[in-house]
């Protein structure tokens, strides 16, 4: 999810709104990687001929994953902290000379990542010799209780006031203790972390000869998320999918996929009461689950010194005539009525803006869901989910409402005020079923969607349809169906995560190169470009057949539709209208520069530059090519391509 400040509705924002900023404050996030360095985690998978097989050890894959996440955060979240703690190492180093936590090595201290931190981690990932010096496993290993206590101290000293603090634990050992007393100590240390406001996210790794079993130890250590948890109120999979080393899909990709799903904490857009009737309210939270990602201009950077620094900005108002700084108490709001500026006091402005009451979601009726056309959507839909923070029992009532709407195939019509000073809107309350992926894991939780409905002046009139509409034939439809079937995405599902915005990625890549003092890339990596070779291999023959069928159908349609030239029709004896006069046609004057053999090279180049070359007839194109000794075989598209190639060779 995007940051809360990006999710705030922008249509009614105003600088002087007196709203509760506690719900919208910028929430800083601190992530500490704890990566196990044991002999099994350092063991590389056996070599195979499969090009997609693993090449990295689990520890190396985890470090590369942390490196990629640090690269992303240095641009997208410049105020968030990130650190890397290795445990089970032969060396003990916490950057402060403290040797209390044995076999714990703080590779990157919990702090806002700098360019030097990213470079050092990159060198460690790419340089095997340097990695071998640090990644030496201890004989006895590290106690998991020591690791959790060390993480507690790091969070307490480095990020004491952060609203989100998370420990990413990467290991393949599903029972890291020897006796039950060690397990009790570890559970106590984990509870201390949770009491501190930190969360533990486990990223388990299964070896080829051993499956990771959470129930042996980590089910008592890692608490699952629940709807009542304010940091993760949306019910997601309580456990992360186990990554398997040595498979065709690399371990690195599995780890990146798992960590990206938890890389950004879920933050509520709003927390409001949902009123089902008089004196019947429940608590809900709203989330923007799908949002267009745009360029994040989160801060200004000053590059005039020895190193770039984030600018702390401030705003002040100045009078035009005297350049005197105007205090906020001296400012007045004014609106023009009839050419005169009418001023209002701050209290009057507040009364005007809050005339519709407090923020609320109020159900005013129900309608069949079939009454809602697909185009009635004026803004981003908001997903709402129950919250027990303000009203106990909200989850049960919310679930009953959602199931009843699904069963009855109905939707709710609601009066929706998102926040104070916001204009009310009418929205449709649409139920959503739970969606699961092929592994049975939850892809989308059950809940309700708030879809903003248009007012009367938001609806535009459809343009008048064309008089003569050419319709396709059944033969063309059948041939196109074959082409579409060959171009289906895997399992017929579009996954936006596989096709990142190329413009946005290029923007981030340039910023990353500037921040890390690297060479600027030459061209972007655009995964939205069609795979032409694969398309031609799959259905090139079918496309050719479709083109031939299309030309035949169009020729037959032209013969049956367009009138033929023939003798002048005789006048109807019963027609009283006078016959139209024949207009004498003037002989066509040959244009200057055009010879008897058709268009010159310069004229054809001009037509091509205007994008009108495809409007030339086949006869004209063939004659032009024939005069220049070029082949005239093929379809019109081939002729056009041949003409353009000839002009390009001439430099026109």
Swiss-Prot record:
Residues 613-647 form the SAP domain. Gene3D superfamilies: 1.10.1600.10, 2.40.290.10, Ku70, bridge and pillars, SAP domain, von Willebrand factor, type A domain. The keyword Oxidoreductase does not apply. One of its GO terms (biological process) is DNA recombination. It comes from the Eukaryota. Residues 603-612 have a biased composition (Polar residues). One of its GO terms (molecular function) is telomeric DNA binding. NCBIfam families: ku70. Heterodimer of Ku70 and Ku80. This is ATP-dependent DNA helicase II subunit 1. The gene is KU70.
């Amino acid at each position: 999810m995007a940051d809360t400040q990006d999710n705030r509705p922008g249509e009614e924002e105003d600088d002087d709104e007196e709203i509760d900023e506690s719900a919208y404050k910028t929430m800083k996030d601190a992530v500490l990687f704890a990566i196990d360095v044991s002999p099994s985690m350092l063991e590389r998978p056996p070599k195979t001929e499969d090009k997609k097989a693993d090449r990295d050890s689990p520890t190396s894959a985890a470090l590369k994953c942390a490196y990629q996440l640090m690269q992303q955060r240095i641009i997208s979240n410049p105020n968030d902290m990130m650190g890397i703690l290795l445990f089970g190492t032969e060396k003990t180093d916490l950057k402060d000379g403290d040797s209390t936590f044995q076999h714990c090595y703080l590779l990157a201290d919990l702090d806002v990542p700098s360019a030097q931190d990213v470079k050092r981690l990159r060198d460690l990932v790419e340089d095997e010799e340097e990695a071998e010096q640090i990644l030496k496993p201890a004989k006895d290993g590290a106690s998991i209780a020591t690791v959790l206590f060390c993480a507690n101290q790091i969070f307490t000293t480095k990020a004491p006031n952060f609203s989100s603090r998370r420990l990413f634990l990467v290991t393949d050992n599903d029972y890291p203790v020897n006796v039950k007393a060690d397990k009790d100590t570890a559970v106590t240390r984990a509870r201390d972390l949770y009491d501190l406001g930190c969360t533990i996210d486990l990223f388990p790794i299964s070896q080829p000869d051993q499956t990771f079993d959470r129930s042996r130890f980590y089910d008592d250590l890692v608490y699952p998320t629940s709807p009542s948890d304010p940091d993760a109120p949306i019910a997601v999979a309580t456990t992360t999918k186990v990554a398997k080393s040595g498979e065709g899909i690399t371990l690195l990709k599995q780890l990146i996929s798992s960590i990206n799903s938890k890389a950004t904490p879920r933050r509520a857009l709003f927390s409001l009461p949902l009123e089902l009737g008089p004196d019947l309210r429940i608590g809900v939270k709203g989330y923007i689950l799908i949002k267009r990602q745009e360029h994040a201009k989160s801060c200004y950077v000053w590059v005039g010194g020895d190193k770039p620094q984030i600018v702390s900005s401030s705003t002040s108002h100045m009078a035009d005539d005297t350049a005197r700084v105007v205090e906020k108490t001296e400012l007045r709001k004014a609106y023009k009525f009839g050419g005169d500026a009418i001023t209002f006091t701050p209290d009057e402005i507040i009364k005007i803006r809050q005339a519709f009451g407090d923020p609320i979601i109020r159900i005013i009726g129900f309608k069949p869901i079939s009454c809602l056309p697909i185009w009635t959507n004026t803004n981003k839909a908001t997903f709402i989910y129950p919250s027990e923070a303000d009203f106990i029992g909200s989850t049960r009532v919310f679930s009953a409402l959602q199931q009843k709407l699904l069963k009855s195939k109905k939707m709710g019509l609601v009066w929706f005020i998102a926040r104070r000073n916001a204009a009310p809107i009418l929205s449709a309350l649409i139920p959503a079923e739970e969606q699961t992926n092929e592994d049975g894991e939850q892809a989308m939780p059950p809940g309700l969607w708030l879809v903003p409905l248009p007012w009367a002046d938001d609806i535009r009139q459809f343009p008048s349809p064309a008089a003569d509409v050419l319709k396709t034939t059944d033969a063309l439809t059948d041939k196109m169906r074959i082409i579409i079937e060959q171009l289906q995405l895997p399992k017929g599902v579009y996954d936006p995560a596989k096709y990142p915005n190329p413009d946005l990625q290029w923007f981030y890549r340039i910023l990353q190169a500037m921040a890390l003092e690297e060479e600027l890339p030459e061209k972007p990596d655009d995964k939205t470009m069609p795979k032409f070779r694969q398309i031609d291999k799959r259905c090139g023959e079918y496309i050719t057949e479709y083109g031939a069928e299309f030309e035949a159908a169009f020729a037959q349609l032209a013969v049956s539709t367009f009138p033929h030239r023939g003798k002048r029709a005789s006048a109807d004896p019963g027609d009283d209208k006078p016959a139209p006069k024949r207009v004498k046609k003037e002989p066509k004057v040959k244009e200057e520069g055009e010879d008897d053999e058709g268009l010159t090279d310069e004229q054809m180049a001009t037509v091509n530059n205007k994008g009108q070359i495809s409007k030339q007839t086949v006869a004209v194109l063939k004659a032009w090519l024939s005069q220049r000794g070029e082949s005239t075989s093929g379809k019109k598209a081939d002729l056009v391509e041949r003409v353009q190639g000839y002009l390009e060779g001439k430099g026109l």
